[in-house]
Amino acid sequence: MAKKSLIQREKKRQKLEQKYHLIRQSLKKKIRSKVSPLSLSEKTKIREQLQSLPRNSAPTRLHRRCFLTGRPRANYRDFGLSGHVLREMVYECLLPGATRSSW
């Protein structure tokens, strides 16, 4: 199981990303807009505003974790579980529709 502090840190990042998502998106849209081209100085001002946002509010800082164990690796997006937890739950028939493979 992952350390509690790492799980809490990831939750904090998710909250920050949700809080600043619209602001970040609008600033990026302004920079990329081809309808009204911006001068170089205007673009740098917008970039400075982007850089002034908290680092942890960037979506690239987020990492998927297993919601049961908090494990950061080998996660299946469909279930939100890590591989070994998924395997155990399938063996115990706790996931409807998921079956063990046999050939």
UniProtKB/Swiss-Prot annotation:
Pfam families, sorted: Ribosomal_S14
Cell location: Plastid, Chloroplast
InterPro entries: Ribosomal_uS14, Ribosomal_uS14_bac/plastid, Ribosomal_uS14_CS
Domain of life of the source: Eukaryota
Region forming the signal peptide: none
Keyword Chloroplast attributed: yes
Coiled coil: none
Gene Ontology cellular component list: chloroplast; small ribosomal subunit
PROSITE patterns, sorted: RIBOSOMAL_S14
Family indicated by similarity: Belongs to the universal ribosomal protein uS14 family.
Subunit relationships: Part of the 30S ribosomal subunit.
Role according to the record: Binds 16S rRNA, required for the assembly of 30S particles.
Designated name of the protein: Small ribosomal subunit protein uS14c
Organism of provenance: Agrostis stolonifera (Creeping bentgrass)
Organism lineage string: Eukaryota, Viridiplantae, Streptophyta, Embryophyta, Tracheophyta
